[in-house]
Amino acid sequence: MRVWPAFLSLSCVLVSLFAFSQGSPSSAVAPGSASASGEAATQKTEALPSRSLADVMDRVIEREHLFLAQMRHMHPMVETYIQDLKTDRAGDTRPAKDQYFLGRLDMSDGAEDQSFIGEPGFGQRMVTHLTGVFSMRFLPLGFAQMVVLDSDFQKQYYNFTYVRREFLGDVRCLVIDVQPKEDAPPGRFMGRMWVEDQDYNIVRFNGTYYPHPKTSYYLHFDSWRLNLRSGAWLPAYIYSEESDMKTALGKALHFRAQTRLWGYDLKGLGKNTEFTQILVDSPQSVKDQSDAAADASPVLAQRMWERQAEDNAIDRLQKIGLMAPPGDVDKVLFTVANNILLTNNLDLGSDLRCRVLLTSPLESFTIGHTIVISRGLLDVLPDEASLAMVVAHELGHIALGDTVDTKLAFSDCMFFPDQDSFQRLDFKRSPSNEEAADAKGLELLKNSPYKDKLASAGLFLKALQQSAPELPNLIRPHLGNGFASSKNVRMSTLLASAPQLEPGRTDQLAALPLGGRIKLDPSTDQVELAKAQTIALTSTREKMPFEIAPFFPHLSRLPNSGSEK
């Protein structure tokens, strides 16, 4: 089955043809009017060394067909976050509303998805009318389809122009412009692709699809692949943006979107390897005569039962691909938690853990004695004091004795489809529990090493409170309690001690953009702190609190992965 590229349509749509009420820019460029070949004509092209372009394209197309065959057997998680944009009176662009999707990609019979988030019926998705304002309604599958340059990639459909060699990170690439022939079937890719020069895999492609049907519109996108297996480059990031595309109603489509894919090796994240390990016990270790060999006391048994429920939930979230395996980021979070505990002379036992939820919405919660913080929240926190504020609130829950629902200790409670995870796993607390955790968290912070640095935490809360009405999906939790709502924020007492928000100052960073702090390995689901470059901001436009930015990953090959012939 052909995987049709992403587009806007009244029958098979990516975006419903309804524009929200903000005025369109004074001038508009027809989508797809700037062809890739036109850009190439303004550049000095280089001669393609050694191989002819025809030979190279034969190999590229062969590798792309192999890529499609591989993707039919993979079911990665796919997350799309979209921010509709508007221009204020000062001429600055900022989010007006947002949309979010999380699911699992299935290309075994064309591009399909298994949604983790309940979607309204097809009719509702097509036309959404909100308080008299027309809104853009995105269907997420189209963004996931941008992992494929062309599901029927053939030389007969395209004209190829070699441009130059170029490094993307550590990987030397051939840069090739791609333009569909006049007699090619509709919906063909038009733009530029980067091909690594060892095995001739496509590692990046940037452009749109062409020609544009009368009742639909193709979006522009920039799709990146990473070397996740020997000889295999798999989709990891897709960035899409439109600033002046005209819809059928004459409004301008203005948005930015990020799509991330991960969870390519979920089977490897399980414990199947332990089953095949040969373990030999020494005779001395077979029988334990120590006190530890005694039956658990009632109190210890209750703790062990709660721990079993906690472990079951964490293992299930990790197996699904929603939680990262234990790693170095957990150690950073634990260090912050330990700093707070030590200065408060608070002993929560040796079983305190910290883990990272792999999704973008801003949320944190506890599963028993495990503190869970989302990747998106870690991304936007500006400093360690702000992180301490988040951790202190969750420590408040643990110190007050808020436990996990022990029904999860029964293993059959973990038998449910992955897409039902948000309905079957619920770690929300009551409003009274949240208020008590706020109070306890503030008490812990006042006796912590962060007590004199909480102004930045309060400033973060002010920025979040200001942005919350436009970003309801970014602040909407899926497993725990919300960090903020359109009216309230967590730990709101800190607002009083925070300085005023000054958007005109480049040295005041109340919150960071999404994606700048945490790096996710799409193959192993491991997370690490990104090695961010220190860059001085040249304008307030570059502050981008809670906003989306393009992807530019540093590409590299797997160690010791030779050329696959």
Q: What do these predicted ranges mean?
A:
Residues 75-79, 175-179, 192-194, 352-357, ...:
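Soluble periplasmic/extracytoplasmic beta-strand elements of cell-envelope proteins
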Residues 1-5:
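Positively charged n-region of N-terminal signal peptides that target proteins for export
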Residues 205, 236-238:
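Beta-strand-dense domains in secreted/periplasmic systems and polymorphic toxin scaffolds
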Residues 23-190, 198-201, 211-219, 227-232, ...:
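Structured extracytoplasmic
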Residues 374, 401, 405-432:
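Substrate-binding clefts and substrate-entry loops adjacent to catalytic sites
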Residues 270-335, 342-363, 378-380, 384, ...:
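C-terminal capping/extension segments of zinc metalloprotease domains
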Residues 377, 385-386, 394-411, 449:
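Catalytic Zn2+-binding segment of zinc metalloproteases
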Residues 8-19:
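Bacterial N-terminal signal peptides
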